[in-house]
Regions:
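Non-catalytic alpha-helical scaffolds and adjoining flexible linkers that form interface surfaces
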Residues: 1-28, 32-227
Length: 227
């Protein structure tokens, strides 16, 4: 988290992960930026005529100016909204998925300055706003969150150490953290190809892959288990 690093002023793009009312008119904000997570205070933001209020919203990309002094929090001295993903707030299911994404990013980025957290959050919000299948968004997000945390899912070798074969069926062995050969297994070449794709390319590319509802459900169940 950036607050522990000595600095004075920065300008950065960011998303609000969490906001908590503080004192009479202020808010403490958890922000994710390309430089990592920042905790900053927005003074007077809850006042009716606050200049900051309209520029700091959930599900929005904002250009922040932040001053760092002796306080444990940064101080937001300026903010300008760059993009608001308005379609998210029009749909309860989208809002629930977005809230899950924000919560997980907030936790995962606590002790990291990895720019990937900003990237995968942004792609998730763009996908939600654009109407990409919610199950595909969740599966892609969980796969990439795990990868960003340094926990790769084994999608290339089975429990016996052999390369996964296109003509074989597999089931997931939780204990071995790998696919095991299983004639009745629910995972074949098509499912594994999509999982590999999810862990290596952008969400918008995955969204173009043709997959029926049954396959999407199967992939999401798998990612929830391993994630």
């Amino acid at each position: 988290m950036l607050n522990s690093i000595a600095k004075k002023d920065i300008r950065t793009l960011g998303y609000v992960l969490r906001r908590v009312n503080y004192a009479e008119f202020d808010r403490i904000l958890n922000l994710i930026t390309p430089q990592g997570k920042i905790v900053a205070i927005a003074k007077g933001v809850r006042k009716e005529k606050s200049k900051l209020a309209g520029s700091i919203e959930m599900f929005s990309l904002t250009d922040f100016n932040i001053h760092f002094g002796r306080s444990e929090f940064g101080l937001i001295t300026g903010a300008k909204m760059q993009r608001h993903y308005g379609n998210i707030v029009k749909d309860l299911s989208k809002m629930e998925t977005a809230a899950m994404v924000l919560k997980k990013i907030d936790r995962a980025s606590e002790n990291s300055d990895n720019p990937e957290y900003f990237r995968i959050l942004e792609q998730g919000l763009i996908g939600l706003d654009a109407g990409i299948n919610l199950k595909i968004i969740e599966a892609w997000f969980l796969m990439n969150l795990k990868r960003t945390a340094g926990e790769e899912i084994n999608l290339y070798r089975s429990t016996d150490g052999e390369k996964l074969a296109e003509n074989m069926r597999y089931s997931w062995d939780v204990g071995e953290n790998a696919f095991a050969k299983d004639e009745r297994g629910e995972f074949g070449a098509n499912e594994i190809k999509i999982l590999r794709l999810m862990s290596t390319v952008d969400l918008k590319v995955v969204a173009r892959v043709k997959a029926d509802d049954e396959m999407v459900d199967k992939i999401l169940r798998f990612v929830r288990i391993v994630g």
